[in-house]
Amino acid sequence: MVMQPNPIYDCYQAVTEEGARKCHLIYMTPQGKTLTQERVRELSEMDDLVFLCGHYEGVDERVIEEIVDEEISIGDYVLTGGELPALILADSISRMLPGVLANEDAFTEESHYGHLLEYPQYTRPAEWQGREVPDVLFSGDHGKVDRWRLEQAVTRTFERRPDMLEAAEAAGELTKEEQEILDALRSV
């Protein structure tokens, strides 16, 4: 089943007030460019976004050519419709907007914001099921805690997503400390 162009175009016209209001229309499709955190950041700076969600076979190509500004995919797999990808995109964008997160700088320390995955997170108790929180996190030495977090982030990225480190290294984006940690990991 392919969605016909007229209902989609009529909806677009209503949303844009017959073209008087410019919106950035994103079609959620597995054929689109894969969503990245950098693109999420860029989209979060735009004023008016509209998501077009196909279903089953998608939408008539003519309406895509007429009104779509960008096609985005959330990964190399197929769902029955674009609704879930649109929700994922909306959530990832909204959390970057002022007032959404309690700590507005929190997202800058999370996985994929830069070129590292996030370091491991722990809560209390200090020991659970025989697994202990690393002692350094109880040390009170913020410098040591920061260094541990950086080492863990680089190590985790090296083990789970080496492609991210390789890209950052090739682009010259690694700090001196990150490069030293990476070099040490490679020498093991």
What positions do the PLM features span?
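S-adenosyl-L-methionine/SAH cofactor-binding core of RNA-modifying enzymes
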Residues: 2-55, 61, 98
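Internal, active-site/partner-interface "lid" segment
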Residues: 84, 96-136
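Short glycine- and Lys/Arg-enriched binding-loop motifs that mark or flank ligand-binding interfaces
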Residues: 50, 71, 77-78, 126, ...
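Alpha-helical scaffold segments in soluble metabolic enzymes
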Residues: 10, 14, 88, 92, ...
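Structured adenosyl-cofactor binding patch, chiefly the S-adenosyl-L-methionine
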Residues: 59, 63-110
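SAM-dependent methyltransferases
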Residues: 125-188
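Fold-independent oxyanion-binding glycine-rich loops
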Residues: 28-31, 53-56, 75, 82, ...
